[in-house]
Amino acid sequence: MALLSSPLCEFGKKMPEFVLKDLNDKSFNSKNLENYDGILIFFICNHCPYVKAIIKKLVMTALDLKKYNVISIAIMPNDTIRYPEDNFENMKKFSEINNFSFPYLIDHDQDIAKKFDAVCTPDFFGY
């Protein structure tokens, strides 16, 4: 994803529904999130210098949010042909190296990123 300005927060906006593959190649359905008090969706990728700069803090924040029954979900929307560092195997490595405690999902065709109006990485959405 290119470097762009994210749109302003739209309070009260309904979260777009999605089904994406996780790192175990299993489907993750957003309809199964109703038992949480909050949802943090963040669009990240492995190669982005901005993501690399905040990843440790992001992982710690996701752990802290669990205490408040808030689930964090990472979505990787990049074209893995153009950015091989973001491919599925490298997503697994990135997740392991950084001790992700949250789902890391792949959005192969950027359909979900478009539904969220995500325009860059990292890009954050709270519900």
Show the residue positions of the predicted features.
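Short active-site neighborhood of thiol/selenol oxidoreductases, capturing the structured segment around
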Residues: 30-54, 58
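Loop/turn elements at helix/coil->beta-strand transitions in domains of secreted/extracellular proteins
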Residues: 37-38, 68-70, 100-102
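N-terminal "domain-start" segment that seeds a small globular fold
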Residues: 1-31
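Structural microenvironment flanking redox-active thiols in thiol-disulfide oxidoreductases
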Residues: 53-96, 112
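Short, internal strand/loop/helix patches
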Residues: 92-126
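Short loop/turn microsegments at loop-to-beta-strand junctions
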Residues: 15-16, 39, 121-122
